[in-house]
């Protein structure tokens, strides 16, 4: 199944704040609420529907396919500890998400384009794989050409850039960043109940 490329407002109306999907979330949600009208009511979800909704939050926020999400679930199950938290770590430590969390792109989709087009380097090598798993001590930098630097500088100047999490360090003067560790659960801005996602897949696999 391919990634969603349809209207983002439709998704945020249904699932709520998805910081990785759109940087205009507050404005979009406000418009959505105005358009719904006072008479509209939400259908009460079943337990399955609630679990499905939480799964959809991950899928749309991180821009991954169903196949990729299932693969991350299977990997997370093989590691000692909370499967849900390991799942979030896999998603958060992806290169495209790391570029986004550093503020080098306004959305994860935008960060994925930077990676795909060869603008991002990891440890002095161009990496064009968005799913590349960033590791502690990895050093990210921008390809040394005007186009790459200008793209990133424009993104950094955007007021929508959120606070950089503690496991990442960005040096704006050199446009380099260091991965200092693994992301902490409290640093993840997405409102998600990862346990419900694990429960959803336990009934699917």
From Swiss-Prot:
Keyword set, alphabetical order: Chloroplast, Plastid, Ribonucleoprotein, Ribosomal protein, RNA-binding, rRNA-binding
Gene3D superfamilies for this protein: Ribosomal Protein S4 Delta 41, Chain A, domain 1 (1.10.1050.10), RNA-binding S4 domain (3.10.290.10)
Biological process terms in GO annotation: ribosomal small subunit biogenesis; translation
GO molecular function term, any single one: rRNA binding
Domain S4 RNA-binding: 93-156
One Pfam entry name: Ribosomal_S4
Family matches, as InterPro entries: Ribosomal_uS4 (IPR022801), Ribosomal_uS4_bac-type (IPR005709), Ribosomal_uS4_CS (IPR018079), Ribosomal_uS4_N (IPR001912), S4_RNA-bd (IPR002942), S4_RNA-bd_sf (IPR036986)
NCBIfam families: PRK05327.1, rpsD_bact
Role, per record: One of the primary rRNA binding proteins, it binds directly to 16S rRNA where it nucleates assembly of the body of the 30S subunit.
Subunit structure of this chain's protein: Part of the 30S ribosomal subunit. Contacts protein S5. The interaction surface between S4 and S5 is involved in control of translational fidelity.
The family this protein is said to belong to: Belongs to the universal ribosomal protein uS4 family.
UniProt-listed HAMAP family: Ribosomal_uS4_B
Protein name, UniProt field: Small ribosomal subunit protein uS4c
